């Protein structure tokens, strides 16, 4: 694979026709090569075809916030933007939260995502997610849905770009969340959802549709 002017990918394949059939605007070059526009949709299709392709976030995104990403965070953000539904099992302390923030911000700038719901334990709603959003996405609006039932419902309805919610009380604001236009859900400490028979999972499942982006994150997948 060769990147051309950060705009296109040139691929050498045994069967280039599978790419030209899946991506009509791609162009076959010779017998075994094809040139594809390097866009988010094209990168997703290539990965669905089993052709590993990086996300254009790697060169087309201005990494926001006070700090620049480490290489592994760029790779994580790239992975997340390629996969509409995926798991992130990076070890604790590797900056998964920042990677997810950059990835989601990129998707919003691309017009793919409008609102993000972050579901996490109460203990990290402020200390991890709110603080990191204020660090890495200062241009975005952020609300923490905590307090009385009426207050939580009002916060969800206010329309912030990111809403941070404790996983233990999704049911209290379920109707508001369903109507909230959340097209990306990030579940942190996802081991709390490993049992699909629990009420917690069944409530979350009501918010997930075919076109919903869903990223499940945990540094301890075996827990």
Labelled PLM ranges:
Residues 49-56, 218-222:
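A broadly tuned preference for mixed-charge, low-complexity surface segments
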Residues 34-36, 189, 216-217:
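Contiguous N-terminal and early-domain "leader" segments and peripheral loops that mark the onset or edge
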């Amino acid at each position: 694979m060769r990147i051309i002017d950060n705009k296109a990918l040139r691929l050498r394949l045994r069967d280039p026709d599978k790419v030209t059939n899946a991506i009509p605007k791609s162009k076959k070059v010779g017998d075994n090569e094809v040139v594809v526009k390097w866009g988010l949709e094209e990168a997703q299709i290539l990965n669905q075809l089993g052709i590993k392709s990086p996300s254009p976030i790697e060169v087309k995104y201005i990494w926001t916030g006070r700090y620049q990403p480490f290489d592994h965070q760029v790779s994580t953000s790239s992975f997340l933007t390629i996969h509409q539904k995926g798991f992130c099992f990076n070890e604790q302390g590797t900056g998964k939260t920042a990677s997810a923030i950059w990835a989601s911000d990129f998707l919003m700038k691309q017009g793919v995502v409008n609102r993000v719901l972050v579901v996490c334990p109460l203990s990290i709603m402020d200390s991890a997610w709110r603080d990191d959003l204020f660090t890495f996405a200062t241009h975005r609006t952020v609300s923490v849905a905590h307090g009385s039932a009426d207050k939580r419902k009002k916060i969800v309805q206010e329309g912030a770009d990111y809403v941070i919610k404790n996983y233990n009380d999704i049911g209290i604001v379920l109707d508001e969340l369903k109507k909230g236009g959340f097209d990306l859900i990030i579940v942190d400490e996802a081991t709390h959802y490993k049992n699909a028979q629990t009420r917690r999972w069944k409530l979350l499942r009501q918010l997930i549709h075919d076109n919903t982006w869903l990223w499940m994150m945990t540094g301890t997948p075996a827990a």
